[in-house]
Amino acid sequence: MMPINLNLIMAFSLALIGALVYRSHLMSTLLCLEGMMLSLFIQMALLISHFHMFSMSMAPLILLVFSACEAGLGLALLVKTSSNYGNDYVQNLNLLQC
């Protein structure tokens, strides 16, 4: 396995572990999700260029568009919850909570 692939897999794994460990604050969860999406984007672009699959060359850009939409919605949710509750705890997003 190439060292760059190993580094990207480790970056994705660390971001996933970070999202699981620091899930109490919405901002840290969003940062970990962005790290996961960035490592997926780079891995996808490298694999497509390595295997010369130029018919799939739009796939990393589509992933990047979905990542930008996710970041925009996440930041809007962060602003709304912090203005309503005064903090960014994920437990405030639970609608079943009384």
From Swiss-Prot:
Pfam families: Oxidored_q2
Membrane topology term: Multi-pass membrane protein
Keyword Heme attached: no
Originating gene: MT-ND4L
Protein name: NADH-ubiquinone oxidoreductase chain 4L
Location, primary (coarse class): mitochondrion
CC annotations in GO: mitochondrial inner membrane; respiratory chain complex I
Keywords for this protein: Electron transport, Membrane, Mitochondrion, Mitochondrion inner membrane, NAD, Respiratory chain, Translocase, Transmembrane, Transmembrane helix, Transport, Ubiquinone
Keyword Transmembrane helix annotated: yes
Function, as annotated: Core subunit of the mitochondrial membrane respiratory chain NADH dehydrogenase (Complex I) which catalyzes electron transfer from NADH through the respiratory chain, using ubiquinone as an electron acceptor. Part of the enzyme membrane arm which is embedded in the lipid bilayer and involved in proton translocation.
Subcellular location field: Mitochondrion inner membrane
BP GO annotations: ATP synthesis coupled electron transport
Species per Swiss-Prot/TrEMBL record: Distoechurus pennatus (Feather-tailed possum)
Assembly information from the UniProt record: Core subunit of respiratory chain NADH dehydrogenase (Complex I) which is composed of 45 different subunits.
MF terms in GO: NADH dehydrogenase (ubiquinone) activity
Family, similarity comment: Belongs to the complex I subunit 4L family.
TM regions (residue ranges): 1-21, 28-48, 59-79
EC number: 7.1.1.2
Record field: catalytic activity: a ubiquinone + NADH + 5 H(+)(in) = a ubiquinol + NAD(+) + 4 H(+)(out)
